[in-house]
Amino acid sequence: METAIIAMETQLQQMLNNLQIAKNEAKEAQQKVAKLEVEISKFQSGIEMMKQFMPAITSEVCKQSVVDPSSNSEKMQEIASGKKPIAEGVSATSPEQTATGKDISKPLMADALPKSINSTNVETSPVQTVTGKDSSKPLMADALPKSINSVKTETGKKSWADIATEDEREPSSLVQLPLSGKKFYVLFNTPRKGIFSDWSQIAPLITGVKGAVHKSYPTMEAAKKALKDAEQMNGLKASSLEKLQPRVPAKKRQSIQEMVMARGGFKQNTPQNTYVFSPENRTMVNKKIFEWKKDEPNSEFYPIEIRGQTKIVLFPGADPVFAYTAYLMGYVKQIIIFEEFKFLSCFPRLFANCVEKFYNKIGRRETVINVRSSFPLLDETMKIRIPAINVAVMAMFNKQFEPFAEEIKLDIQLEDVLASIEGVYERTQKIDERSKLKVWYQSDSTILFGTSPKEIEDVDIRSLLRFEEMFKAMETGPLVNLQDEERKILCQKMQKYKGHSCQLCKSESSGPQTSEEGLQESEDEDFSVLV
């Protein structure tokens, strides 16, 4: 009942966390909408400013260009309705030259208009005369042509239609559209921090990443300065910003071991494991398991029965020393993980980090580690001579618990130890190329898998085959320390598997006696063809 309550509390806490995340995302979305509204209002104000001057320009054009209203009334209607351009509809005041060669057409005067939108208020505008002197004349609209109806002549003058077309091709610098400049984006945290020149490069690195901090800057220099200041504030060593460019993933070849290690993602500053197995710890574990009572609440473990032997299910409330000692003794069948990882602090640091990373990968949901392990062999001084061999698989917990053990049995004999070693090898034989697993951690005595939506890859198959070498020849790994009598008994148990071929098998003249049933089973489970 207490376990169920803990599970319900965990689920409620997870729901609260999800609600908080959704609330933060909604707040960020509102801020983005507000920024977009501000930019849209700026754009609309620019359009309204242009609309204010268009009626005044059109009316002044009509006044200066029309000489005979009766003769040009039809053309003016066409101009007003937009069916005909101004330069084509109004032609009564085309430029004429006198005998002296002077142009008698008058320039369009726009005394009521400002000189330009961004100009300062002045009373006169200097105009250069033919003699090169400046003379003050009434303020003219510089953006307008001097002659509305002037056409391109042999002297190189341009018509109003040509000038209007050029204005359309070359937008005026007076009205700048928002969000039109180049931006550089700085990602201040996460492993991929740096400067990116395009939004498409940084978007995948921040989408769905909690706590990712980024900001845009108009220039590369400003982006570099911001990143350098952030690194100095965090106490980090500033990188070489001169060489900092948009990142491109480096395609480097990794060895099998490097690929397996990379999945753990452990930090170099993680403290080393200082746990040492001792007879006192072994006695403490046996005493706790023997003294367990069904009617008393226990947040550390509870015993179950597997193949006539007593195993335990570990909970996050377990003492770290008890948890790891029980694991080394081969007592652990399941490890249940909710949100706490402190009880794994005595495990190898890479093992614990792989478990935490898998927990985060599946959305921080309840996780279970199913362990198939052997019992260790101890020497006369009660030190481990052959460690427990473990095959563990991480998966999402389905909230189904094993029944309690009716009787606790911890009297382990040599036959039980060798049978448990054979059981571990049998578990590895059930993994084939169709299994949806991935190797997360591997050592001499432990291989840790995690469930995956994809079928097992070749690199993981090769890691499994390396792990199985100790069972096939018994000349590598932990089994190299087997005594002759122990090796002989284990060899007899392993002869039903096709992959087993030790020196004892080769020394027998008749060869290994492989049963028909065992041969068929090993043929189905052999994956040497994949290497």
Swiss-Prot record:
Keyword line: Host cytoplasm, Translation regulation
GO cellular component: host cell cytoplasm
Biased composition range(s): Polar residues: 91-100, 505-517
Residue runs in coiled coils: none
Annotated InterPro entries: Ribosomal_bL9/RNase_H1_N, RNase_H1_N, RNase_H1_N_sf
Cystines in this chain: none
GO biological process, one term: regulation of translation
Location in the cell: Host cytoplasm
Main location: host cell
Residue segments, region Disordered: 80-101, 505-531
UniProt xrefs under Pfam families: Cauli_VI (PF01693)
Bias type Acidic residues, positions: 518-531
Family of the protein in this entry: Belongs to the caulimoviridae viroplasmin family.
Further remarks about this protein from its record: The inclusion bodies are the site of viral DNA synthesis, virion assembly and accumulation in the infected cell.
Name under which the protein is recorded: Transactivator/viroplasmin protein
Biological classification of the source: Viruses, Riboviria, Pararnavirae, Artverviricota, Revtraviricetes
